[in-house]
A protein has these predicted regions:
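Non-catalytic, mostly N-terminal accessory regions of nucleic-acid modification and defense proteins
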Residues: 1-126, 196-199
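Conserved S-adenosyl-L-methionine
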Residues: 105-199
Length: 199
């Protein structure tokens, strides 16, 4: 959102109504879709953003409603890992609610206590490959990432090189449904996996 000299939201320069919709649909979404073609390789955050925006469409029909939503989102902070993690929990709660409401989100969501119990039994270790062949929302992978990032069962502090292994060479997923595919990528990014390996 545009800011004034004091870093506050600039209502005078903010697009709204049809102007905002034209910008989002005609410039912003095509630009973000283009990240996929401009990325160095498929294992980058840029590529994944391009994939997400290749799969979704802007469903908001009112530029005024979109402006209101953007102003609310602009007030949120996503700088620290804790803030990103908080957002990831909100995101997963929304997926869970979709399933509870009888919508298709339920087929992508496995209850987190069940996932945590399975992780406690398996006790994955850094250096192992974790694959989910029917990823849904990627809840298993996100919980396994959190478990390993926090040092596993013994809560041993992990090194920078261990974190790089977690980011790049640990988590792999497959999801054939396009909505679940986008949900999985977003969920993994919000949990801190910067370039999810989802096919």
């Amino acid at each position: 959102a545009p800011k004034d000299a004091n870093g506050k939201f600039d209502h005078n320069n903010a697009l709204t109504g049809d102007d905002l919709m034209d910008f989002v649909d005609g410039q912003l979404f095509p630009y973000l879709k283009g990240f996929k073609q401009r990325a160095d390789n498929a294992n980058t955050i840029e590529y994944k953003i391009g994939e997400i925006f290749s799969e979704i469409k802007n469903k908001i029909q009112s530029g005024y409603s979109l402006r209101d939503a953007l102003e609310k989102v602009d007030q949120l902070r996503f700088r620290s890992q804790d803030e990103k993690h908080e957002l990831s929990y909100l995101y997963e709660a929304k997926i869970k609610n979709m399933g509870n409401a009888g919508r298709n989100g339920g087929e992508y969501y496995t209850p987190r206590p069940l996932i945590r119990a399975m992780i406690d039994v398996v006790q994955p270790k850094i250096g192992e490959t974790i694959y989910d062949g029917a990823a849904g929302s990627a809840g298993f992978l996100c919980e396994a990432f959190d478990y390993l990032r926090q040092g596993g069962r013994d809560k041993v502090k992990i090194s920078t090189s261990d974190l790089a292994v977690l980011q790049n060479d640990t988590f792999y997923a497959k999801e054939k449904k396009s909505l679940a595919y986008v949900i999985a990528i977003m969920n993994m990014i919000l949990h801190g996996i910067e370039a999810p390996n989802v096919l």
